[in-house]
Design a protein with these regions (language model features):
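Bacterial N-terminal signal peptides that target proteins for export
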Residues: 4-14
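Hydrophobic helical h-region of N-terminal Sec-dependent signal peptides
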Residues: 15-20
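HKD-type phospholipase D/PLD-like phosphodiesterase module
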Residues: 26-27, 31-118, 125-236
C-alpha cells in the first residue's frame, strides 16, 4: 500500500515534467519583462500587494549563483570562520531496506511539495527515469508557487542521455514563476528562480577525480521553524 501511494504521487508530477520539456523544445529567446520601479499589475511583474522585504532581499542575493571568477571572497576561509549556531532538531534514520527506500523517496517529494520559500537540491547521480522526472515536476510546481530553487548535479553522475537537457528545461519553469513570500506569508517583489549548475563539466579540462558526491535536499533552509534536511547515500 505504501508503494502504491508513492507511485500515485510520482505519476502526478510526470505530466508537469513532460510539459516543460515540450515547452523548452519549442521555446525561442525568453522575452524580457520590463517592470517599472515599485509594483505593477502587469504580466511577469510583482502584484500590487507585493512588499519590498529586506530579509527576502538578503536571502535572494545570498542565493544568487556567480561564476567562480566573479567571486572576490575566499569562500573556504569564510566557511572556516563562520560561527554556526547549534540548533535542536529531530532526526530520523532511514535504513537500507526496500521499504526505507520508498520512505526516502516519499520524504523528498513531501519536502518539495511543502517548501514555502526555498529548495536546495544537490546530488551526485541524477537520472531522467520515472523518479527523476517526478522530482523535476515537483520542483517546477514549487517554482510556480513562488519557491526559489537551486540545483547542483555532478557532471559525471548525470551523464546519462537526456539528463542535461531535462535540467536545462527545468529552467523554463521560471517563465511562470510565482513571487517569494516572507516569513509572515506576505508576497514580496522577488520572483522565484531556477538556478541549475552542473558541477565540473566533463567537457572541460579538469581533474577527473574532482567530483561532487553530495546527496542533499534542503527545504526552507533560512527559516528555522520550517527548515528540513535529508541527506545520505541515496541518489536520484
Amino acid at each position: 500500500m505504501r508503494g502504491v501511494n508513492v507511485l500515485k504521487i510520482i505519476l502526478r508530477y510526470i505530466p508537469i515534467a513532460i510539459l516543460f520539456l515540450v515547452l523548452a523544445a519549442c521555446a525561442t529567446a525568453p522575452r524580457q519583462e520590463i517592470c517599472p520601479s515599485g509594483t505593477q499589475d502587469l504580466p511577469g511583474c510583482p502584484p500590487l500587494n507585493a512588499i519590498d522585504d529586506a530579509e527576502i532581499n538578503e536571502i535572494y542575493e545570498k542565493r544568487t549563483w556567480y561564476p567562480a571568477k566573479d567571486i572576490d571572497e575566499d569562500l573556504i576561509k569564510l566557511g572556516k570562520q563562520a560561527e554556526i549556531p547549534v540548533q535542536h532538531a529531530r532526526t530520523k534514520f532511514l535504513g537500507p531496506s526496500p521499504h526505507d527506500a520508498i520512505d526516502s523517496l516519499a520524504v523528498k517529494l513531501w519536502m518539495i511539495e511543502n517548501a514555502e520559500h526555498t529548495i536546495d537540491f544537490t546530488y551526485d547521480i541524477f537520472k531522467t527515469d520515472l523518479i527523476g522526472y517526478a522530482m523535476l515536476g515537483a520542483m517546477c510546481e514549487a517554482v510556480w508557487r513562488g519557491v526559489d530553487v537551486r540545483v547542483t548535479i555532478d557532471s559525471a553522475g548525470s551523464i546519462s542521455g537526456g539528463t542535461h537537457s531535462a535540467l536545462r528545461a527545468l529552467g523554463t519553469c521560471a517563465d511562470n514563476a510565482g513571487f517569494m513570500r516572507n516569513s509572515e506569508g506576505q508576497l514580496t517583489t522577488k520572483k522565484a528562480r531556477v538556478q541549475v549548475v552542473v558541477f565540473n563539466a566533463v567537457s572541460k579540462p579538469s581533474n577527473p577525480n574532482r567530483r561532487s558526491h553530495d546527496k542533499l535536499l534542503v527545504k526552507d533552509g533560512s527559516f528555522e521553524e520550517k527548515s528540513a534536511v535529508i541527506t545520505g547515500g541515496r541518489n536520484i
